[in-house]
Regions:
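Conserved catalytic motifs of ABC-family nucleotide-binding domains
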Residues: 312-314
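Conserved S-adenosyl-L-methionine
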Residues: 197-298, 303-305, 310
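Non-catalytic, mostly N-terminal accessory regions of nucleic-acid modification and defense proteins
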Residues: 1-215, 273-282
Length: 314
């Protein structure tokens, strides 16, 4: 990473964290993270959609909005997007459209909820359904912690949207890495403010670096890599700094952290076909059973209580 990108990334991280602190009001940072990280993720999916559609339709000299209005084009772009991206965001639900609504003071939180519902419904029946199912469930837009009225909640989310729009997320060719790194930075910052809760979803950089270096020693290509207690997926994803990893497998007990792990995979540019993150207790039910992995890393909750049931002896 050259110095200019590194400097930009540092500036981006600082701005995002300052924004998170400025907007959260009286809400605990640990709770507010679901809204900030959720909207950054939505921004990424929307931005990715815009670029994908521009490239897909460039030879037809037609905009995404116009293609959507034409039934024949609409069917084709939906099919292509589901195959390549795994989801569809309608033109009216793009992040840039929400920015315009905020500027015109016509945005309300129910529109955002409709946008999320539409995105999630687009994955139903597709190969990506399991990877996207419930991804935004922790971003509870009807929570009174966000505001006591729809107007109050809309105002908070409008500020987040406007603030994200003002941030320069990076150079085109490096956008995934810069945004992915910034996302991971925020996870780390939220972890630091959460105290004892931090271990649920984040392995500190130093231990993570050492684990991945040792696990990939002498390896160039890794077909399958796994983390049985994957948290937010940051440790598992760090493996790609030391080897070419094709498929990622993880299991996470906490549903909120499980959602973070899947978001993290997608933000890092891992295709939905190349990761399988499962929500459940690895000790009680190992989702991957007798599968063999070339590399495994883990930072399990060492102090957690667990059952001494006799079936563990089998």
């Amino acid at each position: 990473m050259d110095n200019s990108i590194q400097a930009h990334q540092k500036e981006l991280c600082n701005k995002l964290w300052a924004m998170a602190n400025a907007l959260r009001g009286n809400m605990e940072a640990y709770e507010f993270k679901n809204y900030i990280l959720g909207m950054i993720f939505y921004y990424y999916l929307s931005d990715r959609t815009e670029k994908y559609m521009a490239n897909l339709l460039k030879d037809d000299n037609i905009s995404y909005a116009d293609a959507w209005a034409d039934e024949e084009y609409k069917e084709a772009v939906i099919e292509e997007a589901l195959r390549d991206l795994g989801y569809v965001i309608e033109p009216k639900y793009l992040f840039c459209k929400m920015v315009k609504m905020v500027e015109n003071r016509s945005f309300d939180i129910e529109f955002l909820q409709s946008a999320i519902n539409s995105l999630m419904e687009s994955t139903i029946g597709n190969d990506s359904q399991e990877d996207f199912d419930g991804l935004f469930s922790d971003m509870q837009l009807d929570s009174t912690k966000l505001g006591h009225t729809v107007k109050d909640r809309s105002a908070v989310m409008a500020k987040i949207i406007a603030s994200l729009d003002e941030i320069n997320f990076g150079v085109e060719d490096t956008k995934i890495d810069v945004l992915g790194n910034a996302y991971e930075y925020l996870i780390g910052q939220f972890a630091a403010t959460a105290g004892k809760k931090a271990g649920e979803f984040y392995t500190p950089s130093g231990p993570a670096e050492l684990l991945c270096r040792l696990a990939c020693l002498g390896l160039t290509d890794v077909k399958d890599a796994a983390d049985p207690t994957c948290g937010s997926g940051s440790l598992l994803l760090r493996l790609k700094n030391y080897a070419n990893v094709r498929n990622y497998y993880g299991q996470e007990l906490t549903s909120t952290t499980y959602n973070l792990a899947r978001m993290n995979m997608i933000l890092r540019g891992i295709p939905y076909r190349n990761f399988n993150i499962y929500n459940g207790d690895t000790l009680e039910h190992d989702n991957f059973g007798n599968m063999k992995f070339r590399v495994q890393v883990a930072n399990p909750p060492y102090s957690a209580n667990w059952s001494a049931d006799m079936h563990f002896m089998a």
